[in-house]
């Protein structure tokens, strides 16, 4: 059984945490994130460590304990280091480009697919077959990357599509002739 919630989080220098009711605000060199946490979980900041505690050992409180601790740890990492996801476009004629603040994908449809840049995210296209998404919120970065990947997920026969960098696509064999 996981005991993530019992681990203390080390707060790096330059990062400041404030709690007002159920709202936790983390401020650091890369920005500021505010998130609400479960009201049954209490957070104590002692020096350069944040500790979390729960009132009892019910299954719901145990789950919220670990989730809350992980969310706050991700907030701290986001404002100090940031998060980054890289995507690759594999396929003949598959291209990505930036037009102003719009990401434009040409991935085999009769029309280009456009995405507006989200608030708090930096989208870059280093070359025509790679997309880089950076931000301080792990959830926002991952959601936006998943939304882009969902336009044309990698197919198992030729491996064409949009994939995360380093993602291994399980390949299938084609039909055999008679």
Swiss-Prot record:
One of its GO terms (biological process) is cytoplasmic translation. InterPro entries: Ribosomal_uL6-like, Ribosomal_uL6-like_a/b-dom_sf, Ribosomal_uL6_a/b-dom, Ribosomal_uL6_bac-type, Ribosomal_uL6_CS. Pfam families: Ribosomal_L6. Keywords: Ribonucleoprotein, Ribosomal protein, RNA-binding, rRNA-binding. One of its GO terms (cellular component) is cytosolic large ribosomal subunit. GO terms for molecular function: rRNA binding; structural constituent of ribosome. This protein binds to the 23S rRNA, and is important in its secondary structure. It is located near the subunit interface in the base of the L7/L12 stalk, and near the tRNA binding site of the peptidyltransferase center. Belongs to the universal ribosomal protein uL6 family. Part of the 50S ribosomal subunit. HAMAP family: Ribosomal_uL6_B (MF_01365_B). This is Large ribosomal subunit protein uL6. It comes from Oenococcus oeni (strain ATCC BAA-331 / PSU-1). The lineage of its organism: Bacteria, Bacillati, Bacillota, Bacilli, Lactobacillales. The gene is rplF.
């Amino acid at each position: 059984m996981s005991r993530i919630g019992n681990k203390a989080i080390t707060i790096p220098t330059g990062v400041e945490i404030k709690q007002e009711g159920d709202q936790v605000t983390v401020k650091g060199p890369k920005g500021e994130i505010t998130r609400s946490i479960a009201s049954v979980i209490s957070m104590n900041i002692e020096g350069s460590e944040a500790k979390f505690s729960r009132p009892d050992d019910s299954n719901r409180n145990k789950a919220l304990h670990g989730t809350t601790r992980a969310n706050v740890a991700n907030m701290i990492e986001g404002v100090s280091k940031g998060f980054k996801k890289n995507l690759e476009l594999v396929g003949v004629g598959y291209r990505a480009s930036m037009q102003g603040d719009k990401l434009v994908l040409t991935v085999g449809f009769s029309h280009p697919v456009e995405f507006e840049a989200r608030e708090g995210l930096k989208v870059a296209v280093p070359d025509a077959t790679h997309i880089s998404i950076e931000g301080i919120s792990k959830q926002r970065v991952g959601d936006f990357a998943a939304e882009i990947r969902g336009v044309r997920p990698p197919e198992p026969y030729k491996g064409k599509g949009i994939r995360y960098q380093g993602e291994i696509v399980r390949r299938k064999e084609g039909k055999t002739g008679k």
